């Protein structure tokens, strides 16, 4: 705990209070921020969590205070001022030989701290999912230091040359090189590939993947490099990670414990459920599907990506549907044919449509006792929301 408190829950709740028009509670929170919130504290904080929860929460509040009528005075600078104060502290994390941010920082000393675990390596997903908040802050302040520091991270990762767009889960802030071979889109791997920008985190340790953030960085900045990295990652995911279940032929996203070329593990974290929504965003460029069809860039590959997004969304919803409570577990181990778990060069691809029989689904979902808990993660809701907005298919509202 920090000596004077950092108000994690207060900051994280600001945008919710604004949307719900809880004016008295918001006024109390705002007064606390203005009078009590101080980042000059003798405290270590996680770089990633502080960026997405604290900085993201302040930036969300700043945006909504300008966008929603009656929320606060349009001249109220408190949220932006606190965001700038915090971001200036966070810049210390990027002061490494490679430009890859350290896992943590000491606030008052403004000093980056290597991870106490994982051999001191930084999480790839954490290092590559700080960009939306930092770039947005540069956009609204005119100070490009936040953009430049965050962009340098992506330049380093892109320069390493991940095999077919699939990045291992750890890299060194000292050398700027990957320190592991393991590839997964769940914990430690999800946001690189796709969470909403500037959404506060609702709880700590919300993990996401590089792929998720690649497409969202492209939609935020229109920088072609992020579209290229996203498309390469999607192709790699389709080639190396997507396998059907043994019985219902549901599409699942497996893991590569030993990297590209190794055998697959049929484990799928709830964290991976951002993927169908992100794939739909990438295929349609964020437009409704009916509008995207008329774009010159629309082709058979985009059709295939939308079909994959639909199939993966069904798998995600099934994780809830097959339990007696209707609540999904944290992890599912899927039934899969041994042939499908071999390396990509040994696997034959399957394009068979999945079954709609829930009785058949139940044979494919294996929930282990230690994984049978729910952390109220938002990934499935996000994908269902995006799939509804993009396809207008009412089934996604029903599932939601």
Locations of regions flagged by a protein language model:
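Glycan-recognition and catalytic cores of secretory/periplasmic carbohydrate-active enzymes
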Residues: 1-400
